[in-house]
Amino acid sequence: MNYVGIDHHRQYSHITWLDEKGEVVKSGRVANRRRELEGFLQGARDVRAVIEAGRSSYTMVDVLADLGIETTVAHPKEVKAIAKAKIKTDERDSYKLAHLLRTGYIPEVHKRSRENRSSQRVLRQRAFYVGKQTSVKNRLRALLAQQGEEIRSEVERVEDVFTDKGMKILKGLALPEREAKLVGALVRTYHHIQERIDETNALVKELYEKMPTARLIQTVPGFGIFLAVLVAVEIEDIGRF
């Protein structure tokens, strides 16, 4: 058995390859490309790899999977707690990972499937859009609150200016030219983001239709489609608990 520790960065990784006795077979920096990785591991048989969980570490996990290499995803903080080092270098970090894998001390985290990660990205993008839209709404409310008494009185005719009735009132406001441009820009931005939210809502609905677990969760009072899909995606496999 061969053990490969990967200290992963956005553009490159430092890889240390240990044999079953713990001797270093090879160590070096490799660009995060399949061809370079294949060249580095040429001749290796019965390989197990380990990489710390990170924002882009799954790109390496997928490449290794395509090469037929099973990869363990390690918990970064727990790795640090187990194997403290006074001097940190890429080489030492990759060796540390390979050594912990060989000795059976890797603190492992749940490794998500490609499909699950894609579903996560859908949900996170929707959350991103909703957050941006909330910022735009707050900015528009603040801008309207800074207008004269007559404008504020018109706006106060509705509880929510983001309803159809509220938007009609905004269009009819007798704002100074510069203020009207500011309000108009925010309204257009609000509608643009709403279109993006609607698009991602459709993707969430597709996920819901494909997920029996999400449909089951949605039967619980208080769970809508988005929350049901979110819980199902985060759990992924109930058997891991």
Residue locations for each model-derived region?
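Catalytic palm subdomain of template-directed nucleic-acid polymerases
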Residues: V229-G239
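Short glycine-rich, Thr/Ser-proximal phosphate-binding strand/loop in the N-terminal lobe
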Residues: Y12-R34
